[in-house]
Amino acid sequence: MTDAKVFDELWQVICERAASESLEKSYVRHLLFHEKGIDKSLEKVGEEAVEFILAAKNGVSEKTVGEAADLIFHMMVALKAADVDFDLVEEELAVRRAGMHLHD
């Protein structure tokens, strides 16, 4: 199993690419600064969500894993576009996880 810090590292890369004007060909910057605004990032989330659903429904595990990774990445970019820090998502998940223990 991979250490959960991979999400923190990915978030850091997304933030760095968003802040750097020197990375004009950055895919992250393309999504964040597209003429459609946040809609571009959200379109990609929708597209990747559908691809994930289809892969999971069809039972192709390798494809499902790849599409899940794509979906998570694009959701993180959309969070950046919405000016929502990923730490807040992690905190929310931790709160929900702690709440689950209360009902066990």
Swiss-Prot record:
Major enzyme class: hydrolase
EC number: 3.6.1.31
Major localization listed first in the record, in broad terms: cytoplasm
Gene that encodes it: hisE
MF terms (GO), sorted A to Z: ATP binding; phosphoribosyl-ATP diphosphatase activity
Assigned protein family: Belongs to the PRA-PH family.
GO BP: any one term: L-histidine biosynthetic process
Matches recorded under Gene3D superfamilies: MazG-like
Organism: Methanocorpusculum labreanum (strain ATCC 43576 / DSM 4855 / Z)
Organism classification: Archaea, Methanobacteriati, Methanobacteriota, Stenosarchaea group, Methanomicrobia
Pfam families linked to this entry: PRA-PH (PF01503)
Protein's pathway: Amino-acid biosynthesis; L-histidine biosynthesis; L-histidine from 5-phospho-alpha-D-ribose 1-diphosphate: step 2/9
Compartmental location: Cytoplasm
Tree of life domain: Archaea
Keywords: Amino-acid biosynthesis, ATP-binding, Cytoplasm, Histidine biosynthesis, Hydrolase, Nucleotide-binding
Catalysed reactions, as listed in the record: 1-(5-phospho-beta-D-ribosyl)-ATP + H2O = 1-(5-phospho-beta-D-ribosyl)-5'-AMP + diphosphate + H(+)
Name of the protein described by the UniProt record: Phosphoribosyl-ATP pyrophosphatase
One Gene Ontology CC term in the entry: cytoplasm
InterPro entries membership: HisE (IPR008179), PRib-ATP_PPHydrolase-like (IPR021130)
CDD domains on file: NTP-PPase_HisIE_like
